[in-house]
Amino acid sequence: MKTAIIYWSSTGNTEAMAQAVAQGVESVGAEAVLLTPDQVDPAALGAYGAIAFGCPAMGSEVLEEMEFQPMFDGCKNNLCGKRVGLFGSYGWGDGQWMRDWENDCGNAGISLVAPGVICCDAPDDAALEACRALGKALAE
């Protein structure tokens, strides 16, 4: 199964998480394609059996608003029936942005394969393993 891993990262933390998700996808023999928001065509998402979205918490615990949020909003209608996962890092707060993002997905009829994977600042070994597990769950 071909899996898209779409992420936005300013410090490299969420990018490291995206790479770990890709490792998980590839560990079960599936194809992982890493994309940034500017590379995403919502109409082309049909080519993927599963999609992971990664975005850090920004500002007052919201998704990045200039590139990522508009791209994600444009993709929502193409995600019903897909295997979807979420991940991201944060530097303060308690992960509220991920709970809000999960609720947004639920309200849009998007079912997630697992709870969103989050970590504070740079991902440690446990966070990277959780990302690999998310990749496996998406691809299996």
Per-range role (PLM):
Residues 7-11:
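Aromatic-flanked redox-active Cys/Sec active sites in thiol-based oxidoreductases
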